C-alpha cells in the first residue's frame, strides 16, 4: 500500500531510518535488539539477579518500565514542577522478584533516573536509542491488548463495545513516534480524536492562542495518521472533512464514530510487530548472538525462531492455569490479540481459546498481592508454524476494498474465509442521521453492503514450516466456516482502566 504517502517500511519507522534496503533495515533493527539485550544484561548484574530470576517476565516488565520512565521527559518535567508527596521525581523503580529459601520474595528497588539513562545509553553505543524504547512500549501495548478488553473506554467516547477489534495500541503513550502510530488501530485513533474534540467543546481556549495552534497541528496530524489507515477513497475523503473542520464539534464526533463502524467491514491497514520482552533479548545477546550482524525483522520468521529457543518464566497465582498464562504471553509476543483464533491456533499448534475462558489474570502482580502462595512456571511460547505479519487488514483486492473480517483485525498474512453476519453490522448504520448525510456516507454504506462474505482474505497466503526460512512453500490451512474465532466477543475480560 504505497498510497500512504510515505513509502517507508515499518522497520524503517522502527529505526527512524532514511530509505534503506532490506539488508540495512535488518541490520538496524538487529542493532536496536542488541541494545535492549545489552541493557537488560547490565540491569540483571546491577540487581544481582540469578539466571532464573533474570528470565522472569515480571522482572523484565519492571526493568522495561524503569527505563521508559527514566526517558519520559514530559512526565519528568511535570513531576519536578508539581512535586507530590512521596514521589521523588528523580528516581524510578518497581518490584523485583527473587527466590529466597524456596519462596518468591518481592523487593522494591529504587534507582536514579540519571543512572538508568546512563546504563541504557552505554548499552546503545552512547545513543538515546529511541527506537529501542518504542519497541518496549509496543511490547507493553501488545500485552495490554491481550490482557484487557477496553469496553469502558469505548463506551465513554460514545463508541460501541463491539468495536474492540479496532482498539490495538490503545494504551500506547503519545510519545511512541511513527512506529507507535503504525500499530494503532482505527478505533484507537478515533478515540484519541474524540477525546480531543470533547476537550475543545468543554474548554473555550483549547484551540486558541499559541497553545491552541500547537493543538491544531497535533489534531491535523492525528487526522492524517487515521486517514492513512483507511483504504477506500470515500473513507479518506471523510477524514479530510473532519481534518479541515474550522471548529471541530459533535458533527465531527459523529463522522468519526461512523468511520470507526465502517472499519469493521472496510478494514483499515494496521501494522503488526512481534515485540518480545527484554528478558528474551538479554540471554540471546549473552549467549553471543549478534543481532546486528545476523539481521533481524519484526514481521518475519525471526521472532518465531527466537521464541523457539528461549526460556521465559512467570509467577503464577494459586488458582491460575500456567497453560493459559502461556497463551496470554504467546499472543502478546506475536501481536495476535485481534487475530482469528482459528488462525492463531493453527500457527501455534495448540488450541487458542477466548479471553473469557482463560483462568489467568494479567502478568503484572499488584503490590498488595500475597507472595507466600506464589509459584512460578515456564511459559510455553513456541509455535508449530510461522507466518508473515500483515498490515493490510485482510483486504486483498486493493482496487476496491473487499471486506475484512468483522470481529478481527488480522495479524498473520494467511488465507481465511469471512464467515461474517453482515446484517448485524449493517443494522448499526440504519437511522443514524446525526452528523452529516453525505455522498461519502452513502458510498461507504454501499461498499459495505456489496462486500461479499464468500470472498477469502489473503488469497493463497499461508503458514510456513519453521525450517522454511525463505517462505518458499506456503501451507494454506482450511478453516471451519461456521464461526469466526474472536478472542474478545461475548466476553468479560478485565478492564484496562480498572
Curated annotation (Swiss-Prot):
Keyword Ribonucleoprotein: yes
Residue interval(s) of motif Unconventional nuclear localization signal: 1-18
Compartments, record wording: Virion; Host nucleus
Keyword annotations: Capsid protein, Helical capsid protein, Host nucleus, Host-virus interaction, Ribonucleoprotein, RNA-binding, Viral nucleoprotein, Viral penetration into host nucleus, Virion, Virus entry into host cell
Modifications after synthesis and translation: Late in virus-infected cells, may be cleaved from a 56-kDa protein to a 53-kDa protein by a cellular caspase. This cleavage might be a marker for the onset of apoptosis in infected cells or have a specific function in virus host interaction.
Domain of life: Viruses
InterPro entries given in the database record: Flu_NP
UniProt GO cellular component terms: helical viral capsid; host cell; host cell nucleus; ribonucleoprotein complex; viral nucleocapsid
Ranges of Basic and acidic residues composition bias in the record: 8-21
GO biological process terms on file: symbiont entry into host cell; viral penetration into host nucleus
UniProt keyword annotation of RNA-binding present: yes
Entry's family note: Belongs to the influenza viruses nucleoprotein family.
Subunit details: Homomultimerizes to form the nucleocapsid. May bind host exportin-1/XPO1. Binds to viral genomic RNA. Protein-RNA contacts are mediated by a combination of electrostatic interactions between positively charged residues and the phosphate backbone and planar interactions between aromatic side chains and bases.
Known function: Encapsidates the negative strand viral RNA, protecting it from nucleases. The encapsidated genomic RNA is termed the ribonucleoprotein (RNP) and serves as template for transcription and replication. The RNP needs to be localized in the host nucleus to start an infectious cycle, but is too large to diffuse through the nuclear pore complex. NP comprises at least 2 nuclear localization signals that are responsible for the active RNP import into the nucleus through cellular importin alpha/beta pathway.
Protein name per UniProt: Nucleoprotein
Organism: Influenza A virus (strain A/Malaysia:Malaya/302/1954 H1N1)
Phylogenetic placement of the source organism: Viruses, Riboviria, Orthornavirae, Negarnaviricota, Polyploviricotina
This protein's encoding gene: NP
Amino acid at each position: 500500500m504505497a498510497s500512504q504517502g510515505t513509502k517507508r517500511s515499518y522497520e524503517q519507522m522502527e529505526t527512524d531510518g532514511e530509505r534503506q534496503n532490506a539488508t540495512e533495515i535488518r541490520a538496524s533493527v538487529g542493532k536496536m535488539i542488541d541494545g535492549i539485550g545489552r541493557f537488560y544484561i547490565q540491569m540483571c548484574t546491577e540487581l544481582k539477579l540469578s539466571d532464573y530470576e533474570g528470565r522472569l517476565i515480571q522482572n523484565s516488565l519492571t526493568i522495561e518500565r524503569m527505563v521508559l520512565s527514566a526517558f519520559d521527559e514530559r512526565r519528568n518535567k511535570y513531576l519536578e514542577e508539581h512535586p507530590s508527596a512521596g514521589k521523588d521525581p528523580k528516581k524510578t523503580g518497581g518490584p523485583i522478584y527473587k527466590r529466597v529459601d524456596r519462596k518468591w520474595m518481592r523487593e522494591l528497588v529504587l534507582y536514579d533516573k540519571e543512572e538508568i539513562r546512563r546504563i541504557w545509553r552505554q548499552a546503545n553505543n552512547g545513543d538515546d536509542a529511541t527506537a529501542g524504547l518504542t519497541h518496549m512500549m509496543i511490547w507493553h501495548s501488545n500485552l495490554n491488548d491481550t490482557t484487557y478488553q477496553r469496553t469502558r473506554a469505548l463506551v465513554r467516547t460514545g463508541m460501541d463495545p463491539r468495536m474492540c477489534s479496532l482498539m490495538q495500541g490503545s494504551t500506547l503513550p503519545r510519545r511512541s513516534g511513527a512506529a507507535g502510530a503504525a500499530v494503532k488501530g482505527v478505533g484507537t485513533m478515533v478515540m484519541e480524536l474524540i477525546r480531543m474534540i470533547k476537550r475543545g467543546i468543554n474548554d473555550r481556549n483549547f484551540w486558541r492562542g499559541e497553545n491552541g495552534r500547537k493543538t491544531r497541528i497535533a489534531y491535523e496530524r492525528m487526522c492524517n495518521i487515521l486517514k492513512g489507515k483507511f483504504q477506500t477513497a470515500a473513507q479518506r475523503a471523510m477524514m479530510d472533512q473532519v481534518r479541515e473542520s474550522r471548529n471541530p464539534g459533535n458533527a465531527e464526533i459523529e463522522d468519526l464514530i461512523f468511520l470507526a463502524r465502517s472499519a469493521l467491514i472496510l478494514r483499515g491497514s494496521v501494522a503488526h510487530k512481534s515485540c518480545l520482552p527484554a528478558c528474551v533479548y538479554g540471554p540471546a545477546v549473552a549467549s553471543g548472538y549478534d543481532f546486528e550482524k545476523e539481521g533481524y525483522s519484526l514481521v518475519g520468521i525471526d521472532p518465531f525462531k527466537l521464541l523457539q529457543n528461549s526460556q521465559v518464566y512467570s509467577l503464577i497465582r494459586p488458582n491460575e492455569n500456567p497453560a493459559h498464562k502461556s497463551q496470554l504471553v504467546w499472543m502478546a509476543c506475536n501481536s495476535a490479540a485481534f487475530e482469528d483464533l482459528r488462525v492463531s491456533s493453527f500457527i501455534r499448534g495448540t488450541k487458542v481459546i477466548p479471553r473469557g475462558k482463560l483462568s489467568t489474570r494479567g502478568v503484572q502482580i499488584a503490590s498488595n498481592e500475597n507472595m507466600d502462595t506464589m509459584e512460578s512456571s515456564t511459559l510455553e511460547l513456541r509455535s508449530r508454524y510461522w507466518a508473515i505479519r500483515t498490515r493490510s487488514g485482510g483486504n486483498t483486492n486493493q482496487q476496491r476494498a473487499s471486506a475484512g473480517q468483522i470481529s478481527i483485525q488480522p495479524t498473520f498474512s494467511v488465507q481465511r474465509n469471512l464467515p461474517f453476519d453482515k446484517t448485524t453490522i449493517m443494522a448499526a448504520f440504519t437511522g443514524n442521521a446525526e452528523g452529516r448525510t453525505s455522498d461519502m456516507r452513502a458510498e461507504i454504506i454501499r461498499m459495505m453492503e456489496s462486500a461479499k462474505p464468500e470472498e477469502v482474505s489473503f488469497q493463497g497466503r499461508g503458514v510456513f514450516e519453521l525450517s522454511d526460512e525463505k517462505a518458499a512453500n506456503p501451507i494454506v490451512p482450511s478453516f471451519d466456516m461456521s464461526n469466526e474465532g474472536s478472542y474478545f466477543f461475548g466476553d468479560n475480560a478485565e478492564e484496562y482502566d480498572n
